[in-house]
């Protein structure tokens, strides 16, 4: 895609963000007709760049995040991309950065999560509406599904060579922490109606991965601890109190 085409794509995105934020009723969808009229392009030009407004919402998030991840401060990180099974359109855009610690299996993901929240805070009113009203896309579910496979890879790294989990336990831990993280993000935007206080959260940006590591360590302390953990997990799945 040429420079002029990229500029058109970004102009469409900027105009869409402006219209979403200015919409008096956030439950009402900004359609393609309104968008192309505002930016003074034809519908064909829009569809040359995006499939629909759902695709546009996804690209806005992914393109800005990828731009941040390609910054020099991430040169030591391992960039990762959407899992193949998601059939994501933007497989060329990195969506994750993995920072390895000094110890084997240690991950320090704080810089990445702070960067993600910075991307959201840049357009806080836009993302408040995108998270809060599913008239374009269930954005919360999109980012959850994007991150669950990435967390599964993280867990595999943290397990190392000598420890193994059942497939269901591995999946459970990845889902639990990925959905928990994004649920908290949505809480700020949709219910607390505020941006994420990134500076105040400096001590806990790596909290999800710290919790995963502590959970894994507790599970593998010994046969008794491992059996207890799996029994509690089974009870939780069955809906019985722990």
Please give the residue ranges for each predicted region:
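Amphipathic alpha-helical linker/stalk segments
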Residues: 18-22, 61-108, 127-131
